Amino acid sequence: MSPLALVSVSDKKHIVPFCMELVEQFNYRILSSGGTAKHLIEANIPVIKVADFTNSPEILGGRVKTLHPKIHGGILAKRTDEEHKRDIEANDLELIDLVVVNLYPFKKTVEQGSKWEDSIENIDIGGPSMIRSAAKNHKDVSVLVDPSQYQNFLEESKKGELKDSYKAQLALEAFQHTADYDTAISNWISKERGLQSSKYIESYPLINTLRYGENPHQKALWYGLSNIGWNSAEQLQGKDLSYNNLLDLESALSTVLEFGYAEKDELTTDTFASVILKHNNPCGASISNSASQAFLNALECDSVSAFGGIVAFNSNVDSETAINLKDIFLECVVAPSFDAEALEILKIKKNLRILKLSKDQLPKKKQTSTKSIMGGLLVQDTNDSEDKTESWMSVTKNNPSNQMNLDLNFAWKICKHVKSNAIVIAKDQKTIGIGAGQMNRVGAAKIALQAAGKLCSDAVLASDGFFPFADTVELANEYGIKAIIQPGGSLRDQESIDMCNSKGISMVITQKRHFLH
């Protein structure tokens, strides 16, 4: 008897030409139900309806269609097992050779904000059962769960009997498909009902095999959600992104987006932001009245470290900005858009990776961040909650001036993205010195203050953590710093406040720490 394919798909892309070739080239009979059967019949493809095949009607509003011994027996039966052969004959089962199933669009349903009841109805039961049955019996049954697999299956079939290794690969992809589906459902229930899960489960498809990891001897893979975030970015030029590129791009964009997207129809003075980043630390940042000026201001902070760095913008890149960018060696430039003339200028630098990532391509605010440790995983809320200035306290006799308040706010936002211990010196809405990743706070302050030098006069200082002693304030005074912003919370806060008062320095305490490791 000719082979039998069970076809039940929510995503009907390519299903008609695929089934047509199954019938015409390989003499398959098609077994189907519901919307898939209707779709194939309308395309003049002969279909055996599941209800006729099982002699059982669909019940419970379509909740039960394929959950039947004639379906699962035909899929799970081992062709060479004598006991199975007897059961097949005794129960009048017909063997199913190919299962083509993809599932109700649960993720899409919940992303659209559907009601609880509607989302529940989009939890597929029969589909995963058929997929798992076929994957378990992959020695005898092939299983396809995605339209992207159809063409390869046809090509492999033309070669003759399918190889065991190929069928095992299909089974692997099938189990990953159902695992991903179950993960989406469990995470949705946890989120919707505010329930704490006893297991941390996430599912990300493979995006790309990277050339190597942080170092050439380390293997690296890129997993991610499709059509969102960096996976959806349009790369306009340059080699494939590396592991380090992706880490730096993420940090650069996260930093520049502290100032929001400067959309073309919403541009106002001081909304243009640019950040230059190297080795996961900002080495320059600014907001100004144009993208070009913001970049030049950021570059002034540390032009040496900017060499080979990443540049991020929160606004369109025009030709003037591109002219300034082309004079320095950079790994990547990312922005929400580029003028045509700007692209022509930038593309002269053949090795420059140019990425376009617009506001609507960003994921919703991340819920958690993770770090692997030996034998486990640390999970925390991401540090992306908005800092509310209403909770900030001016704790010194002198209050910051209006300009100083602007600079304190700016420096605080940048400091959040600098590795701890972090100190940022800023003036006129641009960084002039950054001290990153030091084991003590005064050491980070020395680096930042020395980098800024004479520019420190009337500048502001931001610290990601509190001052355990007054030594950082004393050092800041020597360089002419006039205002400081820090979380507070030290047992010796008063010592630092007293030092500020004695030197005429303003101090603002935010009551929120921004460590970054």
Swiss-Prot record:
Protein name: Bifunctional purine biosynthesis protein PurH
Keyword Transferase: yes
GO biological process, one term: 'de novo' IMP biosynthetic process
SUPFAM superfamilies named among the record's database cross-references: Cytidine deaminase-like, Methylglyoxal synthase-like
PANTHER family: BIFUNCTIONAL PURINE BIOSYNTHESIS PROTEIN ATIC, BIFUNCTIONAL PURINE BIOSYNTHESIS PROTEIN PURH
Alphabetized UniProt keyword annotations: Hydrolase, Multifunctional enzyme, Purine biosynthesis, Transferase
Record HAMAP family: PurH (MF_00139)
EC number of this enzyme: 2.1.2.3, 3.5.4.10
Organism in which the protein naturally occurs: Prochlorococcus marinus (strain MIT 9312)
Annotated pathway: Purine metabolism; IMP biosynthesis via de novo pathway; 5-formamido-1-(5-phospho-D-ribosyl)imidazole-4-carboxamide from 5-amino-1-(5-phospho-D-ribosyl)imidazole-4-carboxamide (10-formyl THF route): step 1/1; Purine metabolism; IMP biosynthesis via de novo pathway; IMP from 5-formamido-1-(5-phospho-D-ribosyl)imidazole-4-carboxamide: step 1/1
Entry's family note: Belongs to the PurH family.
Molecular-function annotations in GO: IMP cyclohydrolase activity; phosphoribosylaminoimidazolecarboxamide formyltransferase activity
Entry keyword Hydrolase: yes
Domain notes: The IMP cyclohydrolase activity resides in the N-terminal region.
Domain of life of the native organism: Bacteria
Catalytic activity: (6R)-10-formyltetrahydrofolate + 5-amino-1-(5-phospho-beta-D-ribosyl)imidazole-4-carboxamide = 5-formamido-1-(5-phospho-D-ribosyl)imidazole-4-carboxamide + (6S)-5,6,7,8-tetrahydrofolate; IMP + H2O = 5-formamido-1-(5-phospho-D-ribosyl)imidazole-4-carboxamide
Ranges of residues in domain MGS-like: 1-145
Entry's Gene Ontology cellular component terms: cytosol
